[in-house]
Swiss-Prot record:
A motif (Antp-type hexapeptide) lies at residues 127-132. It is found in: Nucleus. Residues 146-205 bind DNA. It comes from the Eukaryota. This is Homeobox protein Hox-B6. Belongs to the Antp homeobox family. GO terms for cellular component: chromatin; nucleus. The lineage of its organism: Eukaryota, Metazoa, Chordata, Craniata, Vertebrata. SUPFAM superfamilies: Homeodomain-like (SSF46689). One of its GO terms (biological process) is erythrocyte homeostasis. Coiled coil: none annotated. It comes from Homo sapiens (Human). Sequence-specific transcription factor which is part of a developmental regulatory system that provides cells with specific positional identities on the anterior-posterior axis.
Amino acid sequence: MSSYFVNSTFPVTLASGQESFLGQLPLYSSGYADPLRHYPAPYGPGPGQDKGFATSSYYPPAGGGYGRAAPCDYGPAPAFYREKESACALSGADEQPPFHPEPRKSDCAQDKSVFGETEEQKCSTPVYPWMQRMNSCNSSSFGPSGRRGRQTYTRYQTLELEKEFHYNRYLTRRRRIEIAHALCLTERQIKIWFQNRRMKWKKESKLLSASQLSAEEEEEKQAE
């Protein structure tokens, strides 16, 4: 038989005077005490004393130098704070101003006028050939497919170019730059316009000479 059931340190038969001593010791040598037996606690009265109320599991600190701590209040605090939060949320929703996602156009125009140039000021500023590649007064010369579109000239620009071509069919670089600045065109546009105009003039002169020759030949035939 194992020692778990019978303690080998004490004999089975003891004297009548030692039975009281046996009752104070545990019957198991494995180190586990009887769960039904109660021993006196080192602090305070034992649980065996008669009390009119149940003991609490909360113990104040033993070595507190600032006196005994006040008992904690475990009242229905969550319900109180929940009601308070709901009341605050309702009051905050009433005081919240309406939200405007899109600003007004007048405000945007005012901001542009204060912090930057407006569209009218940008168009009124002079643009020189070395500042911009294409013509700034006209629309973009490139179409949606990326190809260069046909350049259009105003009546004033065409009139001034025709006057210059009437006096000079070939322009110097200095004169070409002056005309480009005066007509708000690029130097390349002036150069291309004069090339096309010379080709047209040559074609017209050829047609005119051909018509003159044909007219002379008819006169000679009639004279014969």
